[in-house]
Structure formats: C-alpha cells, structure tokens
Amino acid sequence: MNLIMPFSIITLTILTIPIMMSYTNKYKTKSYPYHVTSSVSYAFMTSMIPTMMFLLSNQDSYISNWHWMTMQTMKLSLSFKLDFFSIIFVSVALFVTWSIMEFSLWYMHSDPYINQFFKYLLLFLITMMILVTANNMFQLFIGWEGVGIMSFLLIGWWYGRTDANTAALQAILYNRIGDIGFILTMAWLLLHLNSWDLQQIFMLKPTNLLPLLGLLVAAAGKSAQFGLHPWLPSAMEGPTPVSALLHSSTMVVAGIFLLVRFYPLMQNNPTILTMTLCLGAITTLFTAICALTQNDIKKIIAFSTSSQLGLMMVTIGINQPHLAFLHICTHAFFKAMLFMCSGSIIHSLNNEQDIRKMGGLLKAMPFTSSCLMIGSLALTGMPFLTGFYSKDLIIESANTSYSNAWALLITLLATSFTASYSTRLIYFSSLGPPRYLPLITINENNPNLLKPIKRLALGSIFAGFLISNYIPPLITPQTTMPLYMKLSALAVTIMGFMVAMGLNNITLNLKPERPNPLHSFSSLLGYYPNIIHRTTPYYILMMSQNLASLTDILWLEKLAPKSLSQMQLSASMITSNQKGLIKLYFMSFIISMTLATMLII
C-alpha cells in the first residue's frame, strides 16, 4: 500500500487546523501564535515520513486526481503531483517556515495584531505548497496568485508607513506584469492543446515559442529578474520575518520553480534557453553591482537574493534544472538565517539598519555575528558549507557548457562580487570598533531568537551535502575537467574576498571625496527606479495633462457649450439693442395695442 499520499494529506491537514481556529475564540487569545508555530513544526516532522519513503521508493512521481468539473470538452480536476521537486521543496519550506515563525514570536511580540500576522504567514506557506504540488495549470495559477496577494498583505503590514504601502503596491504591480505572461500561456495551451494537465502538455510538447515566452515573463516578474526587479529591494519595508520568508522559500523562488517544472518544454528549444541564460546573467551581475555600494543591511541581503535568482536562471539556461532546484533548496537555509541575524541586529540597535553605524558586534553579539558569518560564507560558496554544493556545481556546469561564454564570464564576475559584498557586510557590522550609540541595551538571550537561528545554521552547514546526494542526474555528468576549470569558482570567490578586504583596509585612511559615476550608478541602482518610477511617469502625466487641457479648451470654448452661448449672445445683441428708453418703449406698446384693437373692430 502506498502511504506517501496519506501522510502528505495529514501534513496539509495539520497546517489547516490553525486556519480553522481563526473562526473560534482561540484566535483571540495570546496563545494562537504558539499554536501556529507548533502546527508547522508537527507538519515538518510528518512531511519527513513521505519524503524518506519517496527517496527510497525509486519512483518518478505519485499523482492523485479528483475530478472537479467539466467545461465543454475540457476536464478540470484537483490534481496533486508528488515528485522529487515538490516533496523535497515542501520539507525545506516547512523547516524554514517553522524557524521563521519561532523567530517571529520574539520579533513581533509587541505587535497588537500578531495573531493575524501569523495567520498570514501560514497562508503564505500553504499557497506556496499548493503551487509546488499542482499538477495542472489552473491549480498552479491559484497558488501563484495566492502567493502574490499574501506578499502584498505582508509587505504592507505596517500600513501606517507610506514606504511600506508603496513597496506593497510595487510588488503587486510588477507581479501583475508577470501574471499577464502566465495567463497568455494558459490561454494558448487551452486553445491549441485543450488541456491544462501537465502530463498531457509534456506529452504533446508544443514547439511554439509564444507559451514559453509567457512562462519566462511570468518567472521574470515573480523572481525579480532584470527589468522587473525594483520591487524586491523595496519589499524590505515589511517586517524582517516577512523578508526572510519571502526571500527563502516562498515568493521569489516561485518563478524559478515554474521554469523548473516546465523544463521538458524548454530543454529542446535553444531560443528560449538562450534568452533565459542571458536574462539570468544580466540580472546576477547588475544586482551584485548594486549590492556593492548599499549601506542598508537588509537591502544588501535582498540584492544578494536577486543575484542568486539570476544564477538559478543561468542554470536553467544551460539546461540544468535539477541544479537550479538544488540551489533553491540550499539558498533557503542561509538566506533565511541571514535575514534573521539582520533582524536581531536591527532590533538590538534600536532599529538601526545602516552598516556604517554598527561595528564591533562580534564581541557584543557573538552568536548572531557568528551565524551571520556562516550565512555569508555559505552565500559565497565557501567549500563544504551548504552553498558550495550547489554553487560550485553550477559554475562547473557553466564551464563545460558550449552555450554562451559571455554569460559564463558575467556569472564568474558576479560570483566574485558576491564574495566582495559579503565580506563588506561582515567587516562593517561585526569587526572593527563599535560605531553605535553607547546607551543601547543589547540582548540575545531569548530562546525564541536563538533556537531558530541555530537550526538554520546547522542547515547552512549540512543541508547541501544531504540534499545533493539525492539529486537525480538529468544529463551524464562530465567525467574529466581541467584543474583550472574545476577551481574557477573557488578562485574568483577568493579573489573577491581579497579585493574586499584590501579595499576595506585602504578606505579607512582616505578622505571623503565626491562619488564617481560608477559609484553613483551602483548606489542609485543603475538609475532604474528614478527613470521608471519618476522621470517616465512625470513626462507621461505632463503630456496627459496638456492633452486634457487642450481637449477641454477645444470642447468647452470652441465647440460647445461656451461657443453656443456666445453665438446666442451675439444674435440677441443684434436683434434687440436695448437703450433704456422706457417712455419710448411704453408709447410703442400703446400704439401697437391701439392699432391691433382697431383692426379687430
């Protein structure tokens, strides 16, 4: 008997219990967040049972199908697909979310609406699980939109702040652009294949470029690729637990997961693979450059997320979706930990986010600073940490790929920049003399803060090794490789470390100077927000205002109604030119009446 699907249903049932509790009086008590956290931890433990059973079963996938409705000739069904991608991702997402929720018990303890906050976090997780386990486009779209609306609600959680509201609107608007591509793909598949079922789509394998372009636009919007990227750093206006969940295992990796899920359609289409490769390469380099000069600790980590998403896109572009999925899973651990460490630092330093006003935290907050270093080193791909097992494989695969040498060089440069801004983050926040106010009380003794970071630190060390052992090879791996190509990823990482340390030591003795154009380009995010959010709307609105004014003048004063009134006024002035001679007017009236009376008689 197959017990994988029943245990998966038990996992989902455990997660829905706190949602049902929100309709009872228990929702109004202070213990509700603890119930939600416990439910997620139990769900993670039960999810490990079907995960181990699946990995030991040597099966490709398990599919459950319940008929829902029939529309003309197309059947809609509630269909769940448990394969390697979905079952591993669900376990990783549950583990990371459990840690983030426990961290939120400490971080959000004073928020008056903490119960609603935890409910939103849980719904965020459930919608992502719907997305990754969906076996048809309609069900996938439900999870896709659910993730989008929950991100809008959570980014704008502190609705009293204008920046938070603006960031939430940015996120939802940029994602609407991606949704257009997704809906166009759904419409094309329905029109030409008469099916939204993934198995039927993969069996028919449409060769048209249009649906694949729609999927690429959808992924670019959701995963903040170049052109649709400005919402990701703006989303840092939300609470830190939201940033951790958004960047690790839910929203931003949904676009990459979509392309991983549809790789059977992309793998034999060189045009879409080249477009994906180039888009990912541009994204990973541009966002790495932007991260080099940022001073907000959360924005540095946010740009590192965008850079890693570009690297995942490059991996899909070289036709290695399993490696992209491995990087999604390994990235979730250290990225969530980095955000939680930054949240701990911000909380202790009285909401200070500027790394130039930190320093010396290795002595004041040794546990948080140590975990921040572990996460940063894992991000750079330091050997035998979690990031190494995916990032090094990706660089090796790119080295042996014949697709695009330009994209490979850009990716290597971005990898070096990753080491540079990670070193800068560690150097400014943890090392050197303290630069924060002396009266700040620093405390990192709360177990709700320490335990989740410890778990994620262990994941950042060991998870990559454990998950990489179960990655099924898509293509026969390279049997031989020159030593210089094997060590290229490590070489550029060490180069980035050395350059960053050298620059940090040199700049301590320099006098302030006017920033050069390259520095301004990086710190102002390539002028992209100013051009897209300020200059372009300004000229469009000015043009619209001028057109509206001209239309009003033409319609009101030249055609109607002012012109009609002017015509009537001119006619009345011509026909009756009044002079104010009342006696003459009265005499004319009497004469007229007398003549009329005589005619009648």
Swiss-Prot record:
The chain crosses the membrane at residues 3-23, 36-56, 84-104, 114-134, 140-160, 171-191, 201-221, 240-260, 272-292, 324-346, 365-385, 404-426, 456-476, 483-503, 581-601. It is found in: Mitochondrion inner membrane. It catalyses: a ubiquinone + NADH + 5 H(+)(in) = a ubiquinol + NAD(+) + 4 H(+)(out). The keyword Translocase applies. GO terms for molecular function: NADH dehydrogenase (ubiquinone) activity. It is a multi-pass membrane protein. One of its GO terms (biological process) is mitochondrial electron transport, NADH to ubiquinone. Belongs to the complex I subunit 5 family. Core subunit of the mitochondrial membrane respiratory chain NADH dehydrogenase (Complex I) that is believed to belong to the minimal assembly required for catalysis. Complex I functions in the transfer of electrons from NADH to the respiratory chain. The immediate electron acceptor for the enzyme is believed to be ubiquinone. This is NADH-ubiquinone oxidoreductase chain 5. It comes from Dasypus novemcinctus.
